[in-house]
């Protein structure tokens, strides 16, 4: 196991160099975790955030393809999307157009009590407490499989984890169509 912690000054070019070294030493592609995407600096300064996120996203995608390694990025969200009654979607991620295009997989993690439809809350006041124990993982995009899947996992934050057994969400969530054609 090789863990390389970088600072906020580590550019994509430096990340690529370290990844090539790790791959050479280990003989297998490394797993790359970027926390978080909008903080990755570029060699050149300037440009708005969308342009910077686009360059970083494209660079990381090229790196993943060249080194044949998975890259997992955590992304910041727009402040407006964090308000009550709003369900986060890919479009709410900062620099979302590049993320929506380049990413093979986009997952959104939400607390269930924040995104379950009101109908499940008003008639059963105890349901709020039950829903607080769960998180919903929404598969917003999956280039190589099913997309628009909602799974729920039980929180086990005492142990810093989620329970490994996920299940499909059965309740209606906010911002879902009531009728489908």
Regions found by a protein language model. Name each.
Residues 74-76:
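Conserved H-loop
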Residues 30-70:
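Helical hairpin unit composed of two closely spaced alpha helices linked by a short loop
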Residues 2-9, 41-54, 81-91:
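Flexible beta-alpha connector loops of hexameric P-loop NTPases
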Residues 12-32, 59, 65-67, 80-181:
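C-terminal regions of RecA-like/P-loop NTPase motor modules
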């Amino acid at each position: 196991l090789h863990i390389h912690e970088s600072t906020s000054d580590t550019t994509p070019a430096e990340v690529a160099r370290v990844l090539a070294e790790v791959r050479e030493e280990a003989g297998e592609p490394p797993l790359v975790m970027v926390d978080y995407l909008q903080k990755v600096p570029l060699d050149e300064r300037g440009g708005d955030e969308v342009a910077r996120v686009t360059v970083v996203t494209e660079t990381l995608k090229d790196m993943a393809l060249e080194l044949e390694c998975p890259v997992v990025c955590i992304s910041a969200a727009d402040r407006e999307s964090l308000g009550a009654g709003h369900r986060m979607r890919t479009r709410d991620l900062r620099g979302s157009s590049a993320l929506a295009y380049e990413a093979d997989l986009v997952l959104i993690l939400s607390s269930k009590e924040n995104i379950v439809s009101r109908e499940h809350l008003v008639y059963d006041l105890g349901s709020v407490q039950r829903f607080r124990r769960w998180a919903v993982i929404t598969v917003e995009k999956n280039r190589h499989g099913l997309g628009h899947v909602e799974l729920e996992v039980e929180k086990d934050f005492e142990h810093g984890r989620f329970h490994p057994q996920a299940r499909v969400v059965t309740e209606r969530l906010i911002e879902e169509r009531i009728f489908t054609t």
